[in-house]
A protein has these predicted regions:
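Compositionally biased intrinsically disordered regions enriched in Thr/Gly
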Residues: 7, 11-226
Length: 226
């Protein structure tokens, strides 16, 4: 059964006022069955901004279409694959696609959050991916990493050096690959960030600089340090 559900909203001060943007959280969920066995579970959260700037409409449409595309992937890819696996005798069910939203900072003009997708199609581990997004909610503009740091000209170099130093001086550098300085340089992507009240958090994909057991590596860069 498929259903779309409005779950919650976040709004500064808890109310909606002129010039203020609220973030609504919607859910698409559908479970897929074959011969009485639940073979796929699809659970997708996506954001919608309620505000006055027309650019927010384009963002909302983008987030909605991304959610529908993921749901279609459950229907057209995961479900046929799961049915085939079931018919071949596999007992590893259900396959799963779970997409969550975590709001990390909201001010009168900035909303920062990340979406995290977990995809399981059998095997020892599922695949987890994370996408960061920071929006100027007054204009609809998607903000960039260096917009929030002091050293805008050399901010990426400063951040990479900061991350390498954090790993080197951490309690257990062994949770990262031995050649982490080279890997930080090679796999750093400036779009992989979100904001908190303390600073910018930069993250790396699984396996980029550390084994799967480490999880998604994250590094807090205080606003005053770069």
């Amino acid at each position: 059964m498929l259903y779309l559900k409005f779950l919650s909203y976040v709004c500064i001060g808890g109310i909606y006022m002129d010039g203020l943007t609220c973030i609504k959280r919607f859910e698409i969920r559908e479970d897929y069955y074959y011969a009485g066995v639940k073979v796929v579970s699809c659970h997708i959260f996506y954001p919608q901004f309620i505000g006055h700037h027309p650019a927010l409409d384009a963002l909302n449409n983008k987030y909605y279409l991304q959610a529908i595309k993921k749901k279609d992937n459950c229907t057209n890819v995961l479900y046929p694959d799961a049915v085939q696996a079931l018919l071949q005798g596999s007992k590893v069910f259900p396959y799963e696609m779970i997409v969550t939203i975590t709001l990390t900072l909201q001010t009168n003009e900035i909303a920062s959050f990340y979406q995290q997708e977990y995809l399981y199609t059998g095997g020892a581990n599922g695949q987890t991916t994370r996408i960061g997004q920071t929006i100027n909610t007054l204009t609809g503009e998607v903000k960039h990493l260096c917009d929030f740091l002091q050293n805008k000209k050399n901010c990426e170099t400063c951040i990479k050096n900061n991350i390498i130093k954090q790993i080197k001086t951490s309690d257990d550098p062994s949770i990262y690959f031995d050649n982490y300085p080279k890997l930080v340089e090679e796999t750093f992507h400036p779009q992989n960030f979100y904001l908190t009240s303390e600073g910018v958090v930069v993250f790396f994909a699984l396996y980029d600089i550390a084994p799967h057991s480490t999880g998604i590596p994250t590094f807090l860069i205080p606003y005053s340090q770069c």
